Amino acid sequence: MKLHHRMLRHFIAASVIVLTSSFLIFELVASDRAMSAYLRYIVQKADSSFLYDKYQNQSIAAHVMRALAAEQSEVSPEQRRAICEAFESANNTHGLNLTAHKYPGLRGTLQTASTDCDTIVEAAALLPAFDQAVEGNRHQDDYGSGLGMAEEKFHYYLDLNDRYVYFYEPVNVEYFAMNNWSFLQSGSIGIDRKDIEKVFTGRTVLSSIYQDQRTKQNVMSLLTPVYVAGQLKGIVLLDINKNNLRNIFYTHDRPLLWRFLNVTLTDTDSGRDIIINQSEDNLFQYVSYVHDLPGGIRVSLSIDILYFITSSWKSVLFWILTALILLNMVRMHFRLYQNVSRENISDAMTGLYNRKILTPELEQRLQKLVQSGSSVMFIAIDMDKLKQINDTLGHQEGDLAITLLAQAIKQSIRKSDYAIRLGGDEFCIILVDSTPQIAAQLPERIEKRLQHIAPQKEIGFSSGIYAMKENDTLHDAYKASDERLYVNKQNKNSRS
């Protein structure tokens, strides 16, 4: 296939790919916009969920403050005795329900620094109010469209005055014991001191990400102050861990998306993060969204490209099939064109070029080569005694002799050269960028090829060689080589 035809084929094939890809790109852009909006919705829903948790924590704190502010009845001797009988010490910590649920009056575990059970009697009598508040908030009706999910977050209460901590869920002291009771000092419970100090403003605080001493995992906490008579008494805390965050960010309406969604919370101050979810394959991201929450928490979401392929497989399959069909049509068209072109300029009997190859375009190309200093050699070839072969052996044998000579010529030249059957037993060879020496050796090389492919045949030929000059036409060059052929043939006949 000629260079310009090959370039045209590549151009059309590239155009087909571009045009069919534009449909896929349009789908990708539309999906990008839709999924970007959906990621914003996920973050807004998570932000609302944090507000809902904040409201619940404030509700629990308010319930505790009402219980503390109410007039307290004196603890009965029986209740005091039950509390002190259940009071235990383990792992350098003291309190109730440390290793087993020995005091049924409390649902969870109370840990204190004091070795005297009398110091926690009043607390043990008041903490059921905390249990009731947590239980009530967990089971209240959800009017927030999924914001108040039925899950068990970790609630606990720190009393700053009496130095005890009460966990709503039982905590085995063998696995975690509160040993540093200086709550307001940095590092005592893992929460940054700046976050604890913000509690003194009276607001509920969402802490930065820190490593929880109990679970050794990165968590966040909501801290709500508890006041009595205008003085800060304690803090109600709600831990938000990775599992809680997975429930908050989980795409319930698009479960397939969760397989390809990356969700990370990062603390912009400390650099700590919580990797909530990771794509199963994570090929590369095609949609991403970043949003900063109050308190220096950055939410980063991204969707892997495999989600688009999986969710839009019909569009992708349609694009692939359309592109393949159109590319195959282009290939078949150019193959047909190549076959037709080859048949148009090829000699049916020998497979060499025919006269139609001698076009003005070829003439201009050869003239440019000559003008640039390259040598173009014309060799005219004519079979000897073809009429005698036809008369004695038949035209079929004569055609065979022509075919064998054409085969020998074709095997003796380069692909860049032109071997042309002008008609009958007349041939013309055009050697491009050759030399007179090479041209002079070509007839001998053709004779050797004839002897090799047809050793039993006596096929002879005569030739004439001419070097094309500037301003020579194809007709001029061939005529000059043909005249030399005639001279050489006359000389050969006179010798025989």
UniProtKB/Swiss-Prot annotation:
Record's function text: Catalyzes the synthesis of cyclic-di-GMP (c-di-GMP) via the condensation of 2 GTP molecules.
Class of this enzyme: transferase
Query: What protein is this chain from?
Result: Probable diguanylate cyclase DgcJ
On the tree of life, the source organism's domain of life is Bacteria
Functional pathway: Purine metabolism; 3',5'-cyclic di-GMP biosynthesis
Q: GO cellular component terms? A: plasma membrane
Cofactor, how bound (note)? Binds 1 Mg(2+) ion per monomer.
Residue span, GGDEF domain: 374-496
Which Enzyme Commission number(s) are listed? 2.7.7.65
Residues that coordinate or bind substrate? 390, 395, 399
Q: How does it assemble?
A: Homodimer.
Catalysed transformations (reactions)? 2 GTP = 3',3'-c-di-GMP + 2 diphosphate
Q: Which SMART domains match?
A: GGDEF (SM00267)
Active site as annotated: 425
Q: What induces it?
A: Expressed during exponential and post-exponential growth, it is slightly more highly expressed at 37 than 28 degrees Celsius and is more highly induced on solid medium.
Site positions per UniProt: Transition state stabilizer: 387
**Cofactors that this protein relies on:** Mg(2+)
State if Lipid metabolism is listed as a keyword.
Answer: no
Q: Which InterPro entries match?
A: DgcJ_diguan, Diguanylate_Cyclase, GAPES1, GGDEF_dom, Nucleotide_cyclase, Rev_trsase/Diguanyl_cyclase
List of residues binding Mg(2+)? 382, 425
Q: Does the keyword Transferase apply?
A: yes
Topology versus the membrane: Multi-pass membrane protein
Task: List the subcellular locations.
Answer: Cell inner membrane
* Alphabetized UniProt keyword annotations: Cell inner membrane, Cell membrane, GTP-binding, Magnesium, Membrane, Metal-binding, Nucleotide-binding, Transferase, Transmembrane, Transmembrane helix
Which NCBIfam families has this protein been placed in?
diguan_DgcJ, GGDEF
Report the gene knockout effect: Deletion of the gene increases swimming motility. Disruption of this gene partially suppresses the reduced motility of a pdeH disruption. Full suppression i.e. wild-type motility, requires concomitant disruption of dgcJ, dgcE and dgcQ.
